[in-house]
Amino acid sequence: YMRSRFLEPCQGQERWRKWALQRSAILTERIDPIDAVSQSELEGCEDADALRSEETFRKSILQTAYFYLGTQYRWGGKTAGGIDCSGLAFMSYFRNGILIWRDAAIKEGYPVHEIPIEQAKPGDLLFFPGHVAIYLGNGKIIHGTGHPESSCVTVNSLWEGEPGYREDLKNSLCAAGSIF
């Protein structure tokens, strides 16, 4: 994966690091155990690729998305101060070293390719008209929504009878995409 560079570890908090964001903003994030392993420690390790396996990467995408849970909806936003659907997808991938476009549709040249909806796995993206969400598995999604009932990053279900079920989303689901 293309790994982004961070500014510096946070003083006195070795499990946290700082990232430079747009317009001189600084983002502080917790380092997961995979990121805590230095490149020199991975050299010569036969299982280095296993440490950054697809499953591990997918889990990390979800952990990053959950960081924003409850963050207020803000059209065009991509920070903990306010975020929209494509901002959540973008930041969840970006903070894990993958640059995807901030778009709510799969377009030619987009780093995410279309897959059959029924083959979506946790960490893949689900697309709706003008909207994108991260698939959690078991019919659940996490997304930044301006919906009147929950104008924030929230978890909803596409399965009737489940908590957080949104019929409008179930009925308008139009595509799924994956980087794998």
Which stretches of residues belong to each language-model region?
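Short, well-ordered loop/turn sites that connect or cap secondary structure elements
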Residues: 120, 126-127
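Catalytic cysteine-centered active-site loop
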Residues: 71-121
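A structural motif
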Residues: 54-64
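Loop/turn positions that initiate beta-strands
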Residues: 25, 39-43, 123
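A conserved glycine-rich beta-strand in the N-terminal activation segment of trypsin-fold
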Residues: 132-133
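Surface-exposed edge beta-strands and adjoining flexible/disordered loops or tails in beta-rich
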Residues: 5-11
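Aromatic- and glycine-rich peptidoglycan recognition patches
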Residues: 9, 17-19, 23, 27-35, ...
